């Protein structure tokens, strides 16, 4: 088995670095362009921005501003901050760092998927993210 290293942050986010990226690390104020997959903690698939068939996006990445003035859930903001382009991380996001209020991003496009996110906002969610690039202007 591969030697997997998990990082646990002070506020309870646990993540695994799947691979290394290259270039400048993402920071608050940057617009992060990334792919994401969300699952329940039991592995049940909810949505993926990648083009993977039924229940997935069309392959277009998501774009959100990092930092406190953004609308990204805290766990994903923390996960993406410090990542380099090409890097992939898998994280267990606790409810306190997840969808703590309605309208937080990212949101799946379909009604049923949004209901899944809403219905399971009180449990840890698994996110896989791959940072494609960052830019400083929206």
Task: Explain the meaning of each model-derived region.
Residues 1-138:
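Cross-family detector of peptidyl-prolyl cis-trans isomerase
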């Amino acid at each position: 088995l591969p030697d997997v290293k998990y990082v646990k942050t002070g506020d309870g986010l646990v993540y695994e670095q799947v691979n290394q990226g290259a270039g400048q690390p993402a920071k608050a104020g940057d617009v992060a362009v990334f792919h994401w997959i969300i699952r329940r903690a039991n592995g049940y698939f909810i949505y993926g921005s990648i083009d993977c068939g039924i229940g997935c996006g069309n392959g277009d990445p998501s774009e959100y501003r990092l930092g406190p003035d953004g609308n990204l859930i805290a766990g994903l903001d923390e996960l993406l901050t410090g990542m380099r382009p090409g890097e992939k991380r898998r994280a267990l996001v606790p409810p306190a760092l997840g969808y703590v209020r309605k309208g937080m991003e990212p949101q799946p496009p379909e009604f049923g998927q949004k209901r899944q996110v809403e219905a399971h906002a009180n449990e840890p969610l698994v996110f896989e993210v791959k940072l494609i690039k960052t830019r400083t202007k929206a």
